[in-house]
Amino acid sequence: MHRFRVLTLCAGLAAGSQVMLSAAKGNADKGKAVFETCAVCHNPDNVEKKMGPGLKGFFKKDKMSNGKKVTDANVKARIDEGGQGMPAYKDMLSDAEKDDLIAYLKTL
């Protein structure tokens, strides 16, 4: 019985720490500042197209304009690679800035 409790406790701690790590990734306030560059082409407060699609509710959508599912990894790849008129930002933004930007996009 003691072994079961220890294993259960360890599993719970491991799961909890994983959730905390993923929740801590990116800072939406910093991401809002990064978004200033994106706002030239994207509306943050509606879905109307500027040069690129409006991004309000972006993470609530099933798919991005390229047909891929809206996930952190796919959004980061889109930021890195660009496409459909969007420039690639792989070498222009740090990984931390991309994480911050993604955190901000989740608030829209």
Language model features by range: what are they?
Residues 28-33, 43-77:
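Gly/Gly-Pro-rich "capping" loops immediately C-terminal to redox-active cysteine motifs
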Residues 1-28, 78, 104-108:
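Post-cleavage N-terminal segment of exported redox proteins
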